[in-house]
From Swiss-Prot:
Coiled-coil intervals, chain numbering: none
Name of the gene: APK3
Phenotype upon gene inactivation: No visible phenotype under normal growth conditions.
Primary role: Catalyzes the synthesis of activated sulfate for the sulfation of secondary metabolites, including the glucosinolates. Essential for plant reproduction and viability.
Full protein name: Adenylyl-sulfate kinase 3
Catalytic reaction annotation: adenosine 5'-phosphosulfate + ATP = 3'-phosphoadenylyl sulfate + ADP + H(+)
Length: 208
């Protein structure tokens, strides 16, 4: 039985330093870049390239990688429906804290269910939640299969694998959609530049 949300006699402690002051210190605005898509669509590749490009510009970011988080924060969760919901909820809460700290948080997760991603959007200030949809075909992702997971899923060795025997619900109103070109995933630098262009246009890379 989950005890999430059942705590009593607790009170919110306000910080003496607010988000505005932290953003001024960093000369940037905190936000969450939420990268979603099938396994093998290039989420982690984009996250790493984006973080590197931001660092080169003197901007502070941090990557929340779905696999990495299952080594620690979410190591008690499996892949049942309720575990997947809790997985995304926890990551959303952590991402919210990073954004509040003034960082550009890059969350890279399959996050297959639309309602869970929308819940994270509601959790974070809407204008500070940037959903990036890696719109790569199942055929391309399965051909790439960098972790060999599709092969295992096709062989019946992995159950509930997104795109094979569990659905992926595409975003309806994402801020950025990255598509394959001529059956290939765009280059990491090209994808990162498109995201950075959006962040620049929306004023996240400076504090004014």
């Amino acid at each position: 039985m989950s005890t999430v949300g059942n705590s009593t006699n607790i009170f919110w402690q306000e910080s003496p330093i607010g988000k505005t002051e932290r953003q001024k210190l960093l000369n940037q605005k905190g936000c969450v870049v939420w990268i979603t898509g099938l396994s093998g669509s290039g989420k982690s590749t984009l996250a790493c390239s984006l973080s590197r490009e931001l660092n080169n510009r003197g901007k502070l970011s941090y990557i929340l990688d779905g696999d990495n988080l299952r080594h620690g924060l979410n190591k008690d969760l499996g892949f049942k429906a309720e575990d997947r919901v809790e997985n995304i909820r926890r990551v959303g809460e952590v991402a919210k804290l990073f954004a509040d700290a003034g960082l550009i948080c890059i969350a890279s997760l399959i996050s297959p269910y639309r309602k869970d991603r929308d819940a994270c959007r509601e959790m974070i200030q809407n204008s500070s939640f940037i959903e990036v949809f890696m719109n790569m075909s199942l055929q391309l992702c399965e051909a790439r299969d960098p972790k060999g997971l599709y092969k295992l899923a096709r062989a019946g060795k992995i159950k509930g694998f997104t795109g094979i025997d569990d659905p992926y619900e595409s975003p309806l109103n994402c801020e950025i959609e990255l598509k394959e070109k001529e059956g290939e995933c765009p280059s990491p630098v090209a994808m990162a530049e498109e995201v950075i262009s959006y962040l620049e246009d929306k004023g996240f890379l400076q504090n004014e």
